[in-house]
Amino acid sequence: MRLVFTGNCVFKRLLHTEIGGKYAKQQPRNLKGRSKSSQEWLTRQLADPYVEKARMMNYRCRSAFKLLEIDDKYGILRPGDTVLECGAAPGSWTQVAVERTNANGKQERAPQGAVFSIDLLHFHAVPGATIFGGMDFTSSLAQKRLREALQDRKVNCVLSDMAPNATGVRMLDQESITNLCYEVLRFALAMSAPQAHLVVKVWDNGDVPKLERDMLRFYEKVKRVKPRASRGDSAEHFLVARNFKGATDS
């Protein structure tokens, strides 16, 4: 099965227009002939405050606010940190990571970090980040490329917003996203600095408690988090693991 990793955000045409220096929402037009799901998507986008905030703050996707909330609460990103991000397209988490770690060097008096972002999809460059587009993180070649790019640096935070293409078969989809989490965990164990952090996306299912227990073997704390920016009807949660203890099982 071929997995497509993405930050769960699709590129859609903006539904806003500039009037008198301020932005006003447009109502969806020409809905006749569109599918019901397309009409529902347009209506939901117009009613979603995070879509508007993302546009106003120049984030590529509303999902930026999920990471912002996690970082505001748990302090996982700091200036000078080295960050690895998996499932990075279209780049909104990358934008946040660059800002919070000062990877773009805009904070003159703060240490400059580094951000490495990978996704199976190609996506536009983010200033301050090293992008690996069109690469399958689970492949040995991709992980070799990441190690080469990191050189001798250890990672202070690993982020994963990866999700497989949903098949509609619940058990298969749950197994697929759990397998992705373990793939990220294994890489994090090999590449993380002491006291590093890890964030992975999960879909609520019976495999999550075991994953939490396995993460607790290597991190001091693990919390299950659903940011306010996650849609209410979404099954997604994030496991936030803090303070890496080392790869040796304790």
UniProtKB/Swiss-Prot annotation:
What is the consequence of disrupting this locus?
A: RNAi-mediated knock down is larval to late pupal lethal with developmental delay. Escaper adults show wing deformation and flattened abdomen, and most are unable to emerge from pupae or get stuck in the food medium due to weakness. Conditional muscle specific RNAi-mediated knockdown results in impaired locomotor ability.
Q: Does the record's keyword annotation contain Zinc?
A: no
Under the cellular component aspect of Gene Ontology, which terms does the record hold? mitochondrial matrix; mitochondrion
Q: Which reaction does it catalyse?
A: a uridine in rRNA + S-adenosyl-L-methionine = a 2'-O-methyluridine in rRNA + S-adenosyl-L-homocysteine + H(+)
This enzyme's EC code(s): 2.1.1.-
Q: Where does S-adenosyl-L-methionine bind?
A: P90, G91, S92, W93, D119, D136, F137, D161
Catalytic site residues? Answer: K201 (proton acceptor)
Instruction: Name the principal localization, coarsely classed.
Output: mitochondrion
Reading the lineage from the top rank, the first entry is: Eukaryota
Q: Which GO terms describe its molecular function?
A: rRNA (uridine-2'-O-)-methyltransferase activity
Report the locations given in the UniProt record. Mitochondrion
Q: Enumerate the UniProt keywords alphabetically.
A: Methyltransferase, Mitochondrion, rRNA processing, S-adenosyl-L-methionine, Transferase, Transit peptide
Give the transit peptide, as a residue range. Answer: 1-35
Q: Does the keyword Transit peptide apply?
A: yes
Q: State the InterPro entries in the record.
A: RNA_methyltr_RlmE (IPR050082), RNA_MeTrfase_FtsJ_dom (IPR002877), rRNA-MeTfrase_E (IPR015507), SAM-dependent_MTases_sf (IPR029063)
Q: Name one Pfam family in it.
A: FtsJ
Please list the GO biological process terms of this entry. mitochondrial large ribosomal subunit assembly; RNA methylation; rRNA processing
Top class in the EC scheme: transferase
Q: What does this protein do?
A: S-adenosyl-L-methionine-dependent 2'-O-ribose methyltransferase that catalyzes the formation of 2'-O-methyluridine at position 1579 (Um1579) in the mitochondrial large subunit ribosomal RNA (mtLSU rRNA), a universally conserved modification in the peptidyl transferase domain of the mtLSU rRNA. This activity may require prior 2'-O-methylguanosine modification at position 1580 (Gm1580) by MRM3. Essential for late-stage assembly of mtLSU required for efficient translation of mitochondrial DNA encoded proteins; methyltransferase activity is not required for this function.
Q: Which family does it belong to?
A: Belongs to the class I-like SAM-binding methyltransferase superfamily. RNA methyltransferase RlmE family.
Listed name of the protein: rRNA methyltransferase 2, mitochondrial
Which species is this UniProt entry from? Drosophila melanogaster (Fruit fly)
Q: Which gene encodes it?
A: Mrm2
